[in-house]
Each structure stands twice: as C-alpha cells, then as structure tokens.
C-alpha cells in the first residue's frame, strides 16, 4: 500500500509539472473585525494604532480569570442578513456571511452572467458554532426534567462547515465548497486551498477567508483552563505582546475576513479592478 500511494503521488506530481498553471489575483475584499465592520474602517483604525481589546460584553466574566477580548462592535447583522434567517445562524456564520457579502460586492462581478458552477467557497474556522453548542447543552443541563429537547437548528448552526455552505446557498455557487479546520492556521489553509483550486483550473472564482466567534463562557473558560489567555485585565490594550519577555498569553478575538480570488484572464475579461 505505501508503494501504491507513492506511485499515485509521483504520477500526480508529473501531471502537475506538465500543466500550464493559472495565475490568481485578488479582486475583492471583505472584513468584519474588532477594529471596524468594513475593510476600510479596519484599515484606517489599524493605521491609527487603535486596539480592539476591551472588557467582554458578550457574557458575565465575574468568575473568569480573563475579562477582556477583542469583540466586533456596533454591527447590525440585519443590514446584511434577514432577521428571520439570522436567527438560524451561529454568530460565526453570520460574520462569515457578512465578510463574503462585502467581498462579492467589492469584486463587482455580474451574478447573472458568471458561471456559478465555477465559483466556489472555501472558508476556514478553528472551532465553529461553540456558542450554539454552549446554549443548547446548558439548557439541557439546567432542565433535565424536560428531556432532551434540542433546537432542530442545533446541528446545522454548530457544525464548522456550515458557513461555506450558507454562503454558497446565498448566491447559488456550485463550485468547490468546503471548510478547513486547522486551529490558528485554518484561514491560511483555506486561502491556500482556494489558490490551488484556481491554479489547477477547477474554478474561476473562489470566495475564501475565515471566521471565528468563540468569545463565550466555553471559549474563554476552555482557554483559561489551558493557561493560554492573557489575564492582564488592567491593561487590555497592551495585553497582546507575543514577542515580549513579559507576555502571559494571547488575547481572544472574533471576526471574519474574505478575499475574492480569481483567475487572472477571467478577471481581465470582465474588466475587474
């Protein structure tokens, strides 16, 4: 079996080496971050040296060692997603969809003319719908007498790959669609995968990026138990210092980012910026 695997890998490498690989360009951006709810706002606040770290507002941190994080602020979900639909989505999926909506709008390709069979979605996420998991399990633990009554959207809201699926369904994209989950490298791996899909000629456009929303009791409590989070509660803005001898852990954040990756000739043919 190892020899057979080597043979297939070797054959694939020869095949790739003889292919004319496509060039890939970025034609659209989307971002929802603790520094801003658009790419422009995020960039300007970054240039101004602002920090997104502040006391946590998502839940009561009285009993937690870490009481601050980088939350997305002042975001009206319903500016992008219908209120009824938003209730069916975990926060991480909401953020992912908003970043994708911004990216698709920025790329400005004609949704009526583009070949949707060659437009894909590949997103990365480290954890997924942890807040949904927390809410459902907490309710069952607090009310066992009611029996196992779970929301029918529990699993669809929680699973890690739902964001890429929701984005595809929103636009009717039928190209490559999957999620990469590799902890802090998830989004980088998603972009690398999207890049390769286009390079190999399997898609013309990939909506790619990453999202996470784990600022909840389970998320913060779990990382606190690992002694992984900073507890510099008196100075949140300067707590993230990975290269300092006085570092004491990372600072949790939430948000989403999107790059519209596109095959060069396809982008030029439609007059992309």
What residue ranges belong to the model's regions?
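Short, positively charged and aromatic/hydrophobic N-terminal segments
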Residues: 9-16
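ACP-dependent fatty acid/polyketide chain-elongation machinery
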Residues: 17-85, 107, 265-273
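Acyl-thioester C-C bond-transforming condensing/cleaving domain
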Residues: 20-21, 37, 48-56, 105-115, ...
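A broad detector of short, well-ordered amphipathic alpha-helices
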Residues: 40, 94-101, 188, 192
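A glycine- and small-residue-enriched flexible loop/hinge segment at structural boundaries
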Residues: 58-109, 113, 160-174
């Amino acid at each position: 079996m190892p020899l057979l695997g080597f043979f297939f890998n070797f054959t694939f490498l020869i095949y790739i080496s003889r292919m004319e690989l496509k060039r890939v360009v970025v034609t659209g951006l989307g971002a929802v971050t603790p520094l801003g709810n658009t790419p422009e706002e995020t960039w300007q606040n970054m240039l101004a040296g602002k920090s997104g770290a502040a006391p946590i507002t998502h839940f009561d941190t009285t009993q937690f060692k870490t009481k601050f994080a980088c939350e997305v602020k002042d975001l009206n979900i319903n500016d992008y997603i219908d209120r009824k639909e938003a209730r069916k989505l975990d926060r991480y999926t909401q953020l992912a969809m908003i970043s994708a909506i911004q990216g698709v709008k920025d790329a400005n390709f004609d949704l009526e003319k583009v070949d949707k069979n060659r437009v894909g979605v590949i997103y990365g996420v480290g954890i997924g719908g942890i807040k949904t998991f927390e809410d459902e399990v907490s309710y069952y633990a607090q009310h066992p007498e009611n029996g196992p009554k779970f929301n029918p959207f529990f699993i669809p809201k929680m699973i890690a790959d739902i964001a890429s699926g929701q984005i595809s369904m929103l636009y009717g994209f039928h190209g490559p669609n999957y999620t990469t989950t590799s902890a802090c490298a998830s989004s980088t791996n998603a972009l690398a995968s999207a890049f390769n899909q286009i390079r190999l000629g399997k898609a013309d456009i990939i909506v790619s990026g990453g999202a996470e929303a784990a600022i909840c009791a389970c998320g913060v409590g779990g990382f606190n138990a690992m002694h992984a989070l900073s507890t510099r509660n008196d100075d949140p803005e300067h707590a993230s210092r990975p290269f300092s001898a006085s570092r004491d852990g990372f600072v949790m954040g939430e948000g989403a980012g999107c790059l519209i990756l596109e095959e060069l000739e396809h982008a030029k043919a439609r007059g992309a910026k």
